[in-house]
């Protein structure tokens, strides 16, 4: 059935994939594409920053005359990488009727993701199945079959899925009604060849001419640009892109200076190397120093969300910054410091989180996210790494410390983003920032003494605010006392209740709240 426009729009409600990722990856170079893998297939792919995904997933259907199978649902695969520090996933899907091998990289020179594929199985054909979510949104996408491949666009952003050997036929439809999976589910084979769909939640599918070859997923601000990038990447050759991908990662790994790494047991050293690579993969390029918390949307498989965890949290960024500092990644550390200075708000605080370009998303205020950048600046000052940023870092620290002094010790939100009050973690970080900023010489003499006095005062009162003794829990555990998670006021934590916003407003005694 070859029809021009697919029926059944706008399609079912758009969602993201699960956050249960197998791995993440990106090239080190001028290419601006990040990928995730989950359940053995390509999940969200981000471009031109690690804040913005443009597809939900790209999976595969394998079919013969009397048989069809979606590899994701079979869920029988193994994933390996060439080494613990080189994010090139090789995925092998096993089935009694077939063996499908995939390898995924991004082109270091272009905004293109490449998949090398090889299918073994008599009388079988391979069908890539792509769900575009242009601009981080599955709604209002437009798609079409073009001579160059499967294309999708929305609001001036375009992608194309092109095949080295081309497609024998292709179709674009609405998810849940006229997409390729529905075609196989209803008819047992590919019978639909819809040439256009949109606006809506789309899925696109094509039958590959060959069972071995290369797919290119390219992104651009124009349809022609995406097609050109895909074609040029395929023409330049997969092996050349892979060689450069591996070379650049190896060169970057040479800059890692983690004391004693080679003396650790192999399982521990591999874990460290993988962790360092994961950190690097979450780093932005258009906005150097930006570090998203996770290339995923934790609740995305149940509903759509524009932000997920692919956002910058100052808290997470500084904690990653200390890890990078421990690994001797000086360039990355300095870039992060400059980025934090740039996104600080005029009154001294940082937004709860933001996209990599600095645009705020959740706009709560958490005092630990105000204090941690000061601790980071103080550490860089101690190690002589601020350089020309010294003046800007001092101005940043002064504004942040003034904000802490004005609004502390209670935080408008605790670090779990539920409630206002005094939290042991936030309070301890705030006290440390006051002392570190003063000791680093970031403050004038009068302000320095005030910061130290305030830190002493909060430190002396910490136990009265967040420590309780001889509660039922303490007696059950045979301990003298414990620190509570949150005290909603400045009175003793032995009294009062907390209404937990992330537990359907359940009310619990302050002294019983842990975490």
Please annotate each region the language model reported:
Residues 4-90, 162-184, 251-260, 264-265:
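An extended acidic
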Residues 260-269, 286-289, 324-337, 380-398, ...:
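Structural helix-adjacent loops and short alpha-helical linkers that scaffold large soluble proteins
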Residues 1-8, 96-100, 107-308:
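Acidic/polar, glycine-enriched structural segments that form the non-catalytic walls/loops
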Residues 249, 278-287, 328-351, 392-413, ...:
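Long, well-ordered core segments of solenoidal/helical folds
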Residues 120-121, 141-144, 151-156, 160, ...:
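Aromatic-rich carbohydrate-recognition surfaces in CAZymes
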Residues 138, 154-182, 262-271, 366, ...:
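Extended ligand-binding clefts on enzyme/binding-domain cores
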Residues 2-53, 312, 320, 363-383, ...:
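C-terminal capping/lid segments that line or modulate ligand- or cofactor-binding pockets
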Residues 24, 28, 255-265, 298-317, ...:
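Solvent-exposed loop and edge beta-strand segments that line ligand/cofactor-binding
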């Amino acid at each position: 059935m070859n029809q021009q426009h697919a029926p059944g729009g706008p399609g079912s409600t758009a969602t993201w994939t699960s956050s249960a990722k197998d791995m993440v990856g990106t090239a080190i170079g001028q290419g601006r594409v990040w990928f995730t893998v989950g359940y053995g297939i390509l999940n969200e792919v981000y471009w031109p920053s690690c804040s913005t995904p443009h597809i939900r997933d790209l999976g595969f259907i394998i079919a013969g005359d009397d048989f069809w199978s979606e590899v994701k649902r079979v869920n029988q695969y193994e994933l390996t990488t060439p080494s613990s520090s080189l994010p090139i996933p090789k995925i092998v899907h096993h089935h009694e009727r077939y063996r499908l091998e995939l390898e995924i990289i991004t082109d270091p020179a272009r905004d293109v993701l490449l998949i090398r594929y090889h299918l073994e199985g008599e009388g079988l054909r391979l069908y890539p199945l792509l769900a575009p979510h242009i601009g981080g949104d599955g709604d209002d996408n437009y798609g079409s079959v073009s001579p160059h491949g499967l294309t999708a666009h929305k609001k001036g952003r375009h992608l194309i899925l092109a095949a080295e050997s081309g497609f024998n036929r292709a179709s674009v439809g609405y998810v849940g009604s006229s997409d390729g999976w529905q075609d196989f589910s209803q008819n047992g084979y590919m019978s639909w060849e819809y040439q256009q769909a949109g606006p809506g939640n789309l899925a696109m599918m094509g039958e590959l001419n060959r069972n071995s070859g290369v797919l290119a997923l390219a992104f651009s601000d124009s349809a022609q640009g995406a097609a050109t990038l895909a074609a040029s990447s395929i023409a330049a050759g997969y092996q050349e892109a892979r060689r450069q991908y591996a070379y650049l990662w190896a060169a970057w790994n040479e800059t890692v200076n983690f004391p004693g790494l080679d003396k650790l047991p192999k399982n521990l050293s591999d874990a460290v190397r993988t962790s360092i690579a994961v950190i690097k993969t979450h780093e932005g390029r258009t906005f150097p120093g930006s570090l998203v918390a996770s290339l995923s949307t934790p609740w995305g498989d149940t509903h759509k969300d524009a932000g997920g965890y692919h956002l910058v949290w100052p808290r997470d960024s500084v904690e990653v910054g200390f890890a990078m500092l421990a690994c001797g990644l000086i360039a990355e550390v300095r870039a992060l410091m400059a980025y934090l200075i740039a996104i600080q708000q005029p009154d001294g605080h940082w937004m709860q989180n933001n996209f990599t370009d600095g645009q705020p998303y959740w706009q709560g205020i958490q005092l630990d996210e105000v204090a941690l950048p000061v601790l980071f600046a103080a550490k860089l000052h101690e190690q002589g790494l601020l350089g020309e940023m010294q003046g800007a870092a001092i101005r940043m620290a002064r504004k942040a410390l003034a904000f802490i002094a004005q609004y502390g010790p209670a935080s408008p939100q605790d670090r779990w983003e539920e409630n206002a009050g005094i939290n042991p973690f936030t309070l301890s970080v705030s006290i440390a920032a006051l002392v570190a900023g003063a000791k680093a010489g970031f403050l004038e003499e009068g302000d320095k003494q005030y910061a130290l006095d305030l830190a002493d005062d909060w430190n002396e009162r910490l136990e009265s605010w967040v420590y309780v003794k001889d509660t039922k829990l303490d007696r059950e555990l045979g301990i003298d006392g414990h620190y509570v998670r949150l005290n909603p006021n400045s009175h003793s934590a032995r009294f009062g209740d907390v209404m937990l916003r992330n537990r359907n407003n359940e009310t619990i005694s302050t002294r019983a709240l842990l975490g």
